[in-house]
Amino acid sequence: MAKSFVPLIAVLCVLVLPLAAMAVGTPFHIEGSVYCDTCRFGFETIATQYIRGARVRIVCKDRVTLKSELVGVAVTGPDGKYKVAVRGDRQDQQCLAELVHSPLSRCQEADPGRSTATVILTRSNGAASTRHYANAMGFFRDEPLRGCAALRKRYLADGDNRAI
């Protein structure tokens, strides 16, 4: 009885092998965006300006050795978005998209709360897609634009003007 299953199992293994090889060699595609926080609110608003030419890098850190490795770099396009292909499954490494540089002279200070974004670079988490999205990252403008106080009122809860 067991001998009758051996050819079937062998055929299944041969058929699955190319799929496994393709998955290992297929790069991950990371997408994200970079913006200038023109009101220094710490989040995107209708006054947000997306940055063309901002530089971003993808860095992975091994959780055991704590060694960091640069695995990708990108520059944002006209809409402030970047795309970068990263080869290799990073399994249990912690990977981050990090801001490197803003070409806008009045928007150079990285927002400490939005200067990095976690990216998942493993096929062992159940996600079938190789396309992954990083949270938007931002730089603060040196001085807020005029009209930011009025904009802040729009974003506050009804009647909560204490924060202004």
Swiss-Prot record:
One GO CC annotation: extracellular space
Q: Where is the signal peptide?
A: 1-23
Q: Which cysteines are joined by disulfide bonds?
A: 36-107, 39-148, 60-95
- Chief subcellular location equals secreted
Entry coiled-coil feature ranges: none
Q: What keywords are assigned to this protein?
A: Disulfide bond, Secreted, Signal
Specify whether Disulfide bond is a keyword of the entry: yes
Q: Where in the cell is it found?
A: Secreted
> Could you confirm whether the keyword Disulfide bond appears in this record?
yes
Q: Which InterPro entries match?
A: Allergen_Ole_e_I_CS (IPR006040), Pollen_Ole_e1_allergen (IPR006041)
- Please give the Pfam families that the UniProt record associates with this protein: Pollen_Ole_e_1
Task: Give the induction text.
Answer: Epigenetically down-regulated by vernalization.
Q: Which domain of life is it from?
A: Eukaryota
Q: What does this protein do?
A: Part of a three-gene cluster containing FLC, UFC and DFC, which is coordinately regulated in response to vernalization. Not regulated by FLX.
Its family remark reads: Belongs to the Ole e I family.
- What is the protein's given name? Protein DOWNSTREAM OF FLC
- Which gene is this protein's source? DFC
